[in-house]
Amino acid sequence: MNRLKEKYLNEVVPALMSKFNYKSIMQVPKIEKIVINMGVGDAVQNPKALDSAVEELTLIAGQRPVVTRAKKSIAGFRLRQGMPIGAKVTLRGERMYEFLDKLISVSLPRVRDFRGVSKKSFDGRGNYTLGIKEQLIFPEIDYDKVNKVRGMDIVIVTTANTDEEARELLALLGMPFQK
């Protein structure tokens, strides 16, 4: 069993139970899924850019991403409906915990001038979104093979009803929030 999942079951659940006075263990918020999205704007002019993005996302997530397509045509961006413009991957279960563990303990500390992640990025429904400016912070990405620095969005979806519960859950799991 994953180290983070073990920590969740043995330490986080009892701590949250006592803090928020839940009646049942099923009320304790848990992480449902993690969605990693990579928008590749230059895929419009250069379709090969998408292939490298998909490859990098596969390495990062350990799972093959799905290619996202344009919903509408936008003339200003020379975009037609249905053109591939990005990639996203949804992690659940073991892979999700492995990714989160790696993100918290290895990748985030590698960000330049890292002072912690923002406390304001909750959406009011107990989900947390975090943007990453470059994919090089992940240990799986080989610096020499990268042709372009790309960012990505990471959404952590929890079953928490309020932001406060979600913040507490992530903080207990080790998410480095700003002081």
UniProtKB/Swiss-Prot annotation:
The keyword rRNA-binding is annotated on this UniProt entry: yes
GO BP annotations listed: translation
Xref: Pfam families: Ribosomal_L5, Ribosomal_L5_C
GO cellular component labels: ribonucleoprotein complex; ribosome
InterPro entries: Ribosomal_uL5, Ribosomal_uL5_bac-type, Ribosomal_uL5_C, Ribosomal_uL5_CS, Ribosomal_uL5_dom_sf, Ribosomal_uL5_N
SUPFAM superfamilies for this protein: RL5-like
GO molecular function ontology, one term from the record: tRNA binding
Keywords, in A-Z order: Ribonucleoprotein, Ribosomal protein, RNA-binding, rRNA-binding, tRNA-binding
Family named by the database record: Belongs to the universal ribosomal protein uL5 family.
Record note on quaternary structure: Part of the 50S ribosomal subunit; part of the 5S rRNA/L5/L18/L25 subcomplex. Contacts the 5S rRNA and the P site tRNA. Forms a bridge to the 30S subunit in the 70S ribosome.
PANTHER family assigned to the protein according to its UniProt record, in alphabetical order: 60S RIBOSOMAL PROTEIN L11-RELATED (PTHR11994)
Function: This is one of the proteins that bind and probably mediate the attachment of the 5S RNA into the large ribosomal subunit, where it forms part of the central protuberance. In the 70S ribosome it contacts protein S13 of the 30S subunit (bridge B1b), connecting the 2 subunits; this bridge is implicated in subunit movement. Contacts the P site tRNA; the 5S rRNA and some of its associated proteins might help stabilize positioning of ribosome-bound tRNAs.
Protein name: Large ribosomal subunit protein uL5
The species this protein was found in: Geobacillus kaustophilus (strain HTA426)
Lineage: Bacteria, Bacillati, Bacillota, Bacilli, Bacillales
